[in-house]
Amino acid sequence: MNYQTILEEIEKEIQALFVEGKVASYIPALANVNPNQFSMAIKMFDGQTFGVGEIDKKFSIQSISKVFTFTLALNYYGKELYKRVSHEPSGNPFNSLVQLEYENGIPRNPFINAGAIVTADTLVSIYKNDTFNQILDFIKMVSNDKTIDFNEEIFHSELEHGFRNYALINMIKSFGNIHNDIDEVIKTYFKQCSIMMSPSQLASSMLFLANHGINPITNERILTESKAKRISSLMLTCGHYDASGDFAYKVGLPGKSGVGGGIVAIVPKKMAICVYSPKLNTQGNSLIGTKALELFTTKTGLSIF
């Protein structure tokens, strides 16, 4: 199968969609990106890369970071983690307060904001004031790339404008499900969302999940096959907020989106994919990125179903 040709076909077919969607505007630093960007990268287990667009241009990974922090936490705590954050789809917007109150401060899953904040708290319990460095080092390790870092401007923009996330962490704290200082936890969370990566780096970073826990480039086991499968299943059922069912229906791959415009997806035992296009649909997922992945699975037949 000629993946490069398929990517070039997809790039042509999505052009008409550039009139739709809006870039994230809840923090100013995200609103300033060029809305008409599109890039897509595929990483194979043998190290081959296929791509269209500027696949080495970095963007803010935002909620894609939740996959890395959940991996770290699940690796350390195992099933104990589910006492703090559940593993069910939410059906509500990613920053919803309503369900959180109804369910006594236990977030539905680690991929909505409340769940990722609790996950960050569990990591602060382990790593204390070195938590962000540990997260960043883990991402560098699974990406085989030591150049990855966060963006100070986006981090400070999140700190100044992330009011809904402050509301979430205070509500969770009131239910006793935040064990550390809330300022330390929220700063860790905002910093992880401000990490900058390219489609090429992000596709590389997901190969260990596509390979059931082993990085196929280095042959290093990152986590057990069982835990890798759990994370992949959560990506399928919860990876796109309240549009997760729609993504599973149309794309049929485990994936995770971020409001920065990125989406990662994995084809088990084959490859990892990252697509970037900053215009979002109403659920906060990349509109063109979702369509590009739908076209990819249609053209290749590589859905998990």
UniProtKB/Swiss-Prot annotation:
Name the reaction it catalyses.
Answer: L-glutamine + H2O = L-glutamate + NH4(+)
tRNA-binding recorded as keyword: no
Iron-sulfur found in the keyword field: no
| Molecular function as annotated in GO | glutaminase activity
EC numbers listed for it are 3.5.1.2
Q: Cross-referenced InterPro entries, in alphabetical order?
A: Beta-lactam/transpept-like, Glutaminase
Q: Which Gene Ontology BP terms does the record give? A: glutamate biosynthetic process; glutamine catabolic process
Keywords from the UniProt entry: Hydrolase
Question: What general EC class does the enzyme of this chain belong to?
Answer: hydrolase
For this chain, the family text in UniProt reads:
Belongs to the glutaminase family.
Q: What is the protein named?
A: Glutaminase
> What species is this protein from?
Aliarcobacter butzleri (strain RM4018)
